[in-house]
Each structure stands twice: as structure tokens, then as C-alpha cells.
């Protein structure tokens, strides 16, 4: 009986030591916050781990290491991109991924052109170029994109040259008669950084279409800020 008890105790002790060693092996020195070492997101059947680069001597290289770009067009963007639109930092982006993207209540949008997106993006992002939101509201591509945001074209929506002209002139009847935003998803848009106007233009385009400002978020630091903090960047397949 004593031998069995000692044997069981020894097994438990060994298991405890192995668990501690295993935890130490995977412990990170460079965490996101004191309480969060990483965040995981699944996209297209693949799981991505958002964490910071662990090499503490790592330095930014390439285009995002630059401090100066010709302005215009690469001018500093305001902290508040539009009234009612919240501006997010990195922790809020990760929280949005965890709480909104994972539950299909929100979409993280890489608003850059496809060539930029192909070079690397934030895990969990969907590429919708800012140019899409400048299309005519009757354009099939825009209508399909809006459907992905759970925004449907109203069955009674008017269309045609005269309707589009009134919209351009700002004399179209409000509230928006064309789109139904009652079930619209929350959107968090980003681009290359605080000097990039792609996501601000996307947000302005969405607002012009009637998208509720309270459902739009802006990650101003964008890819440059994300890389400065050594956070995970994925290359789309």
C-alpha cells in the first residue's frame, strides 16, 4: 500500500515538474500586455497567433522604417477622422478581433489597394480597397461588398441618373432611402499608418453612403504602427 502511494506521489511530482518546464519553455519575454502574451484568430480554416517579435534587438527595416514622405499625397491624418467615428490603438484592435471578428459581429478591413495587401496584412483582416466605396451605389461590386456587411439595398430604393445626381448634389432625401443599415456590422478600417489616406477615404465614402458613424472605427497607426510594436503580420495566400 505504501509503495503504491509513493509511486502515485512520484508520478504526480514528475507531471508537475514537466508542466512547469513546459510552461517556462513557451513563456514569452515580450508580451502584448502584462496579462496577455498573445491572441489567436482563425481565418479561412487557418489559426493565426498574434504576438510580438521576441528578438529584443529587432529593428524595423524597409518602407515602414521611413519617417518622411512627400506631402501631398502622404500627409499626416487627424486623430479624429470624422465625427462619431472612434479611433483605435493596437490593444483596441486586438480586442475588436477577439470580441467582434470572432463572433461575426464586426469586420476588420484592410482598406489598402490589393498590391499593398499582398505584401502583408494584420491577421483577421479582409481586403476591401478604399476605391470600392467611391463607386456608384448601383454598382454591382459595391452592392456585393455591402451585403457582406449585412447591409441590403432597400426593395423600394430608387435608382437612375436623376437619383444619383441628387445624391451627388447632396439633395437626396434623408434618412438614406437606398440602403438598409438596421443590421449593419461594425467595421474597423486601417491602412499604412498615420500618413496614409486610404482608410480615411474609405470611411468618408462609407459615411457618404449613409453608413452609421457609430459602427465605424479607425485604426490610425495602421501597418506602420503594427510593425513598430513587432506584432504578427501575415502574407495572404
Walk through the language-model features, giving the residues of each:
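Bacterial N-terminal signal peptides
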Residues: 11-23
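Solvent-exposed loop/turn segments at secondary-structure junctions
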Residues: 113-117, 132-135, 193-197, 222-226
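Catalytic cysteine-centered active loop of the rhodanese-like fold, especially the PTP/DSP P-loop
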Residues: 146-223
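Bacterial N-terminal signal peptides that target proteins for export
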Residues: 1-13
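Active-site neighborhoods of enzymes that stabilize oxyanions during catalysis
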Residues: 229-237
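Structural recognition of the beta-strand scaffold that forms the well-ordered cores
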Residues: 107-110, 125-129, 186-190, 216-218
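Aromatic- and Gly/Pro-rich amphipathic surface segment
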Residues: 61-84, 139-172
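Flexible, polar/low-complexity N-terminal or interdomain linker segments that lie immediately upstream
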Residues: 25-122, 130, 137
Amino acid at each position: 500500500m505504501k509503495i503504491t502511494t509513493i509511486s502515485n506521489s512520484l508520478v504526480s511530482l514528475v507531471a508537475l515538474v514537466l508542466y512547469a518546464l513546459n510552461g517556462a519553455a513557451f513563456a514569452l519575454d515580450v508580451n502584448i500586455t502584462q496579462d496577455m502574451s498573445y491572441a489567436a484568430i482563425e481565418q479561412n480554416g487557418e489559426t493565426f497567433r498574434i504576438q510580438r517579435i521576441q528578438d529584443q534587438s529587432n529593428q524595423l527595416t524597409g518602407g515602414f522604417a521611413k519617417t518622411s514622405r512627400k506631402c501631398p499625397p502622404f500627409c499626416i491624418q487627424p486623430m479624429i477622422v470624422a465625427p462619431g467615428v472612434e479611433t483605435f490603438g493596437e490593444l483596441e484592435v486586438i480586442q475588436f478581433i477577439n470580441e467582434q471578428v470572432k463572433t461575426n459581429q464586426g469586420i476588420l478591413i484592410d482598406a489598402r489597394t490589393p498590391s499593398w495587401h499582398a505584401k502583408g496584412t494584420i491577421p483577421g483582416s479582409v481586403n476591401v480597397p478604399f476605391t470600392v466605396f467611391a463607386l456608384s451605389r448601383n454598382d454591382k461590386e459595391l452592392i456585393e461588398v455591402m451585403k457582406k456587411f449585412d447591409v441590403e439595398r432597400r426593395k423600394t430604393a430608387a435608382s437612375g441618373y436623376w437619383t444619383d445626381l441628387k445624391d451627388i448634389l447632396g439633395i437626396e432625401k434623408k434618412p438614406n432611402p437606398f440602403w438598409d443599415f438596421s443590421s449593419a456590422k461594425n467595421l474597423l478600417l486601417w491602412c499604412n499608418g498615420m500618413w496614409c489616406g486610404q482608410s480615411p477615404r474609405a470611411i468618408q465614402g462609407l459615411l457618404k453612403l449613409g453608413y452609421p458613424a457609430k459602427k465605424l472605427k479607425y485604426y490610425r497607426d495602421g501597418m506602420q504602427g503594427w510593425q513598430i510594436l513587432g506584432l504578427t503580420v501575415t502574407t495572404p495566400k
